[in-house]
């Protein structure tokens, strides 16, 4: 026994002596938790442990994804060398060969079909520096108007609503630190317990302090279990529910008349409209009983402080922007904004969902959240870039609309960075066919994803452990992620790939950067004076202070913890309310005899986005090895579906097969399927192509479907 103990302690001593520690930041959700990877070398093997590091946002917490993130970074299928497709097979080539091949094909396409025959498709998982550089690359190196990114499918509705209501879009109007002290919270369409687990303690502390929590979700989730009141609206009726809440608040005088008079436009029009509505009709449309609507409205309206949080559940609709605006109508009409423990939070999905939409990846945007159609904004950014403003392209189209442009033959070449559009987009078969139609397609990725399989060239990118640069997290806090390890093989930093490609295209003078910090220095200048002003933020400050909330206009500025304390960002300083009709401009799919159920989609805790990274992590993949269909047992019985049996789900656009999972807590008319899988299990094959007319968000959360047991289908 003594000998065994000695052997154990000597082994542990050896592990400690061989330890290397790498500080990093999680590559997944918008919390951007700080972490430390511990590498222990034991003889010829290496073992890794990840621990959380204290920081202002996650306070040292990690979830299961963060603890296992390193597994995909060290996966044997990581891309380490450039690949070119020859006779249908990928062949390893040198960087010089790959870049020259891209140059020849890009130049040929533009010579034959014009500058806008090339398009760029970006990502909200890359750093601010890379997002900024990608927007500049599209407009300066390629001179194309066609650039958009996968954040269009994630945050566009909330961003549009905040910009229109407040004049500025920062994920949170106040810091996370205020959540525990608010008196009432509305969680609309957000499952933070599974999607952003490390944010949950803020809400748990609020509950401990006596806050009343109202959850709005057609499903019962780990998040709704925290709530004092759970409203289960029919999928797609959240805007109508918000009208009901607002009607009660106005009728029972829970609005802040002084705040409205001094700081709000449009209230009278909204008041007139909602007072004309019938609560009985609202109940019939939403499926939420009048007494529960009234209970929620009275509680939120009567409390001295309150916050509203939205996420994809209310945003991923063809009226997602207007739906969020209606929840913001509630917020501003009750005066719960710009004050202590009051405000709005858009629970950003992707790691850099906030920063990636601020600095030029969006079709209509320039750095600093400037508009590409505004001449003053164009002149300023062109001056920073050293080009003629007339050479800047005008606005392009959204991510999904670029797929339509490919089908129409206008776009013939694509540069794709760190995204998987044939899995993440709606009407996925149409998107896959678009990618196949491209004359030339370049993908930058960690792995040969489902989309990258179709590429002519794949360039190996850097993972979070090798990458360097800033990320802007869920509350609008800019943080610095230092590089921990060198890139494996011949893989390069994403920003280096962009600079190398610009060089072979003859644009080196605009992309002569030698570090991410140099890029950030230019980004600071380009954002200066914009609504998303990063000028006062430096790498030195981020290292010392652990992160800064923008806007931060000067290097001696402490950052902005709470927005709109005295004024909103519109020219007149007022917030803008707007009437949100019960009937949406773009009709949503309605149930019928052939398609009698609503399909809604979402995440599970162990996976992220299209699963390209998490499906390469054994510890995460094992938790959910396949998608599932959550269905109420009574509904399952109606369609002869057994628990844990294979089921065919079919919409007007296609079908998939998944395994059933009975749930007593989901609505009888609704099924839920997570979206992290591809090919025959890609649930987005079933989703409509219709887009929100304001922000171009697809309607992922409402599709009319039918279900049947696979055994019947096969026979």
What is the predicted role of each segment?
Residues 11-14, 24-25, 31, 430, ...:
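Phosphate/diphosphate-binding loops
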Residues 357-363, 518-619:
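Long, low-complexity segments enriched in small/aliphatic residues
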Residues 88-89, 254-290, 367-382, 386-391, ...:
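N-terminal leader/propeptide and maturation segments of large enzyme subunits in energy/redox metabolism
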Residues 301-402, 475, 509, 553-558, ...:
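A glycine-rich, hydrophobic/aromatic-adjacent loop/helix-cap motif
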Residues 488-490, 494-545, 594, 610, ...:
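Long, contiguous, secondary-structure-rich segments that constitute the structural scaffold
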Residues 192-201, 420-430, 469-472:
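Glycine/threonine-rich flexible loop motifs
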Residues 1-252, 263, 270, 276, ...:
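N-terminal export/assembly segments and adjacent metallocofactor-ligating motifs
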């Amino acid at each position: 026994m003594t000998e065994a103990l000695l052997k154990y302690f000597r082994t542990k001593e050896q592990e400690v002596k061989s330890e290397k520690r790498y500080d990093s930041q999680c590559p997944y959700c918008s919390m951007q938790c700080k972490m430390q990877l511990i590498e222990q070398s034991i003889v010829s093997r290496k073992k890794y442990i990840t621990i959380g590091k204290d920081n202002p946002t996650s306070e040292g917490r990690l979830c299961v994804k963060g603890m296992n993130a390193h597994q995909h970074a060290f996966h044997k299928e990581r891309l380490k060398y450039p690949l070119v497709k020859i006779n249908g097979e990928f062949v390893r080539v040198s960087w010089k060969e790959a870049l020259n091949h891209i140059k020849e094909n890009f130049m040929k396409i533009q010579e034959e079909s014009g500058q806008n025959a090339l398009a760029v498709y970006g990502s909200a998982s890359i750093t601010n520096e890379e997002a900024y550089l990608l927007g500049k690359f599209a407009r300066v190196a390629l001179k194309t108007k066609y650039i958009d990114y996968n954040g269009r499918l994630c945050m566009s509705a909330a961003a549009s609503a905040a910009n229109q209501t407040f004049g500025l879009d920062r994920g949170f109007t106040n810091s996370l630190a205020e959540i525990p002290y608010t008196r009432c919270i509305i969680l609309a369409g957000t499952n933070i317990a599974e999607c952003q687990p490390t944010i949950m303690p803020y809400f748990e502390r609020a509950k401990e302090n006596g806050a009343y929590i109202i959850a709005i979700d057609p499903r019962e989730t780990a998040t709704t279990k925290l709530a004092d009141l759970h409203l289960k609206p029919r999928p797609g009726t959240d805007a109508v529910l918000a009208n009901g809440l607002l009607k009660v608040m106005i009728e029972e005088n829970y609005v802040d008349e002084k705040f409205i008079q001094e700081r709000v436009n449009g209230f009278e029009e909204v008041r007139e409209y909602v007072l004309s509505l019938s609560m009985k009709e609202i109940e019939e449309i939403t499926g939420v009983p009048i007494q529960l609507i009234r209970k929620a409205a009275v509680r939120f309206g009567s409390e001295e402080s309150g916050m509203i949080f939205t996420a994809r559940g209310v945003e991923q609709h063809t009226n997602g922007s207007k739906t969020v605006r209606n929840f913001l109508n509630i917020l501003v009409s009750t005066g719960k904004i710009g004050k202590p423990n009051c405000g709005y939070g858009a629970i950003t999905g992707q790691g850099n969902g906030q920063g990636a939409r601020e600095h030029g990846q969006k079709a209509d945007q320039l750095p600093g959240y400037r508009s590409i159609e505004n001449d003053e904004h164009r002149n300023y950014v062109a001056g920073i870039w050293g080009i003629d403003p007339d050479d800047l392209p005008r606005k392009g189209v959204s991510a999904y609309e670029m797929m339509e442009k490919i089908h129409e033959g206008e776009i013939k070449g694509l540069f794709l960075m760190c995204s998987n559009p044939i899995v993440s987009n709606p009407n996925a078969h149409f998107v896959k066919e678009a990618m196949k139609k491209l004359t030339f397609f370049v993908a930058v990725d960690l792995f040969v994803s489902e989309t990258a399989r179709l590429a002519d060239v794949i360039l190996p990118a850097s993972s979070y452990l090798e990458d360097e640069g800033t990320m802007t997290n869920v509350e609008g806090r800019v943080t610095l992620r230092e590089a921990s390890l060198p890139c494996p093989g011949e893989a390069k930093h994403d920003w280096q790939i962009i600079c190398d490609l610009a060089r072979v295209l003859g644009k080196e003078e605009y992309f002569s950067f030698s570090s991410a910090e140099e890029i950030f220095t230019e980004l600071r200048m380009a954002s200066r004076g914009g609504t998303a002003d990063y000028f006062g933020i430096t790498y030195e400050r981020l290292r010392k202070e652990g992160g800064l909330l923008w806007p931060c206009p000067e290097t001696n500025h402490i950052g902005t913890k709470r927005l709109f304390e005295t004024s909103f960002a519109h020219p007149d300083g007022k917030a803008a309310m707007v009437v949100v009709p019960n009937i949406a401009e773009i009709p949503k799919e309605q149930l019928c005899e052939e398609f009698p159920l609503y399909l809604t989609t979402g995440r599970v805790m162990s996976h992220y986005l299209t699963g390209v990274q998490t499906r390469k992590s054994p510890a995460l993949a094992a938790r959910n090895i396949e998608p599932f269909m959550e269905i109420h047992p009574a509904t399952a019985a109606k369609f002869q579906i057994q628990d844990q049996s294979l089921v065919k789900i079919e919409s007007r656009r296609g079908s998939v097969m998944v395994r059933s999972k009975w749930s007593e807590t989901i609505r009888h008319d609704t099924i839920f399927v997570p979206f992290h899988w591809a090919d025959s299990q890609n649930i987005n094959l079933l989703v409509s192509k219709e887009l929100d007319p304001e922000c171009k968000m697809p309607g992922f959360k409402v599709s009319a479907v039918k279900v049947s047991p696979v055994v019947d289908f096969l026979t």
